[in-house]
Amino acid sequence: MTRPYLDKTSPDVWKAASALSASIADHAASAGLTPAETEYIKVRASQLNGCPFCLDLHSREARAAGITQQKLDLLPAWRDAELYTDREAAMLAIAEAATRMPLSENSAADLAAARGLLGDEAFAAAEWVAVTINLFNRISILSEHPVRPRDAEGKLVK
């Protein structure tokens, strides 16, 4: 049995969540995060949470933001791949720390290193992006939002 879509059954709450997401996206951009950097956070958190809808959406948006397919394919092994810049690695570490609770000693160390690299404003903005995608992952998972088939260019297959 399919559960109700939270976004459809509570449209005012969905509108508020969407407004929060838009505000955080604006804040992230003003703090110096690139669209690719925010997509790294969204894709990695969605992988960890097992959210198919958000993975489908944000993988396409990541490619549109310039992230290579190779880097997307290797995200589960990013720490060993040696392909990612220091900033990209910081985004991925933030995504993992914000998604895997409670914070471990390793996660706390990763966050401290990311903060040192990014500075407080960009670091906090990245954390907000991670918090927000975790919210949307849970909405989509609980709503059982479907993933629709797409062709190689990302267009819906009829």
Residue ranges and their predicted role:
Residues M1-K158:
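Hydrophobic alpha-helical segments
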